[in-house]
Every structure is written in C-alpha cells, then in structure tokens.
Curated annotation (Swiss-Prot):
Stored Pfam families: UPF0181
Disulfide bonds: none
InterPro entries: UPF0181
Top-level taxon of origin: Bacteria
Protein name: UPF0181 protein plu2693
Family: Belongs to the UPF0181 family.
C-alpha cells in the first residue's frame, strides 16, 4: 500500500505523540486517538510537502 504522509519536524512529531497520549488519558482508545491526530495532521499539511511511504504488510 502506498500513502503520502506529511513531512513533520521532530517537534511536530513530539506534539502529535503528546496529544495522542493526552487523548488516551482522557479515555479515548489508542486507535481512535491516532486516527484523530493523523486526520488533523493531514488537514493541517494539505498542499504542503508530503513523504511517500510504502507499507509492506499487505500480502
């Protein structure tokens, strides 16, 4: 599977992790928290630099 992902600085990555952790402390499941933060990042970085990644887990 191919996917374009936002190119994030280390600081942006750290903030995303902290937000996911906070959402989980507030009772959200890890999957929901990750999905929410990922969607927010995609929206915020729409039209900006993207990094193409390949997920090799599909067989």
């Amino acid at each position: 599977m191919f996917s374009a992902m936002p190119a994030l600085s280390h600081e942006e990555q750290q903030r995303a992790v902290e937000k996911i952790q906070q959402l989980m402390v507030e009772g959200m499941s890890s999957g929901e928290a990750i999905a929410l933060v990922a969607q927010e990042l995609r929206e915020r970085h729409r039209g900006k630099e993207q990094v193409n990644v390949v997920f090799d887990d599909e067989k």
